């Protein structure tokens, strides 16, 4: 097993999909096996990939005061080193990691401590998505500083940028013979002007779903595997809305292979469509312990075999105290 190495090269391999649709509750461990796509593997040998995806992560010490006494390793110490044993770990960072203090008017602004990022990297986190409705909480200056701080910590940021092309551009990783693309899409805008523009910093795509689909297609054109991190839906909803299901299917039809959803702050069902897993909402990971519906969580685990077969399951997690998630059972 190899840890992710960023690279912009590509085999150019594309797959065609079989058909499989199933729903499972994400609060339970489940297994969903997709049919391998024709034509895999591509040029050169490929290994088995293990990818983990999570829901919302806050590294804001005003939201989680325990960080001031326990340190930022507290956020990850209950995961049993899970993210160090995989090939790629992606999380939704629900705040700008910045010292810029320029809060935009909103009910619940968040600001993460940039000093928390090295602990996330040491825990095995590789990619953080800023495609969410809090990345812009300190305006364009805070967002751009956050992206720089993330990179300085050895992490890769997706889902936001200095303009829309940068915000929607996928990060590319060369891992064990595979070219893996990861992109972030923000559908949960508050307000809408947080979205990036032609010459304006912000988050990716917004409510322009045609633009989001084009981002998926662009990533698929130069990658073997496409992972989409999307912030969408309605907070505290127990199930995805019909429009989300339709959008998820369209993203897979456009070339997405794995979809990790966030924003509702609680787990939602998992679907397998055309052999590709859709985690509609992974709930909270590093977050205050608020209600049973929001402190019961999961980490998505996706395994891609050398022949292209995709298996997926949810690993149960409980937020046992503010900012401290713990794996319920070690896999």
Question: What residues fall within each predicted segment?
Answer:
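Secretory targeting and sorting signals
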Residues: 6-8, 12-34
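Acidic, metal/ion-coordinating pockets
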Residues: 3, 29-331
């Amino acid at each position: 097993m190899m840890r992710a190495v960023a690279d912009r090269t590509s085999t150019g391999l594309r797959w065609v999909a079989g058909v499989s649709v199933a729903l499972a509750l994400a609060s339970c461990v489940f297994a969903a096996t997709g049919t391998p796509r024709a034509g895999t593997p591509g040029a050169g040998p490929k290994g088995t990939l293990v990818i983990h995806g999570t829901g919302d992560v806050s590294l804001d010490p005003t939201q989680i005061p325990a960080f001031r006494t326990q340190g930022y390793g507290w956020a990850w110490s209950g995961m049993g080193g899970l993210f160090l044993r995989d090939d790629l770990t992606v999380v939704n960072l629900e705040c700008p990691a910045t010292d810029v203090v320029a809060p935009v008017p909103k009910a619940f602004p968040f600001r993460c401590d940039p000093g928390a990022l090295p602990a996330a990297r040491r825990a095995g986190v590789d990619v953080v998505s800023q495609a969410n409705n809090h990345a812009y909480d300190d305006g364009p200056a805070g967002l751009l500083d956050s992206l720089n701080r993330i990179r300085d910590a050895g992490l890769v940021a997706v889902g936001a940028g200095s303009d829309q092309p940068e915000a929607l551009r996928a990060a590319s990783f060369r891992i064990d013979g595979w070219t893996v693309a990861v992109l972030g899409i923000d559908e949960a805008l508050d307000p809408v002007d947080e979205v990036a523009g032609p010459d304006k910093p912000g988050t990716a795509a917004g409510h322009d779903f045609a633009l989001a689909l084009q981002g998926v297609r662009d990533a698929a054109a130069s990658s073997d595997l496409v992972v989409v991190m999307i912030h969408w839906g309605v907070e505290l909803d127990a199930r995805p809305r019909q429009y989300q299901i339709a959008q998820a299917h369209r993203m897979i039809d456009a070339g997405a292979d794995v979809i990790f959803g966030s924003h509702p702050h609680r787990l939602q069902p998992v679907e397998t469509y055309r052999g590709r897993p859709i985690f509609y909402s992974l709930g909270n990971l590093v977050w205050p312990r608020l209600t049973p519906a929001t402190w019961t969580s999961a980490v998505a685990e996706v395994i891609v075999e050398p022949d292209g077969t995709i298996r997926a399951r949810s690993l149960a997690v409980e937020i046992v105290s503010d900012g401290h998630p713990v794996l319920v059972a070690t896999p």
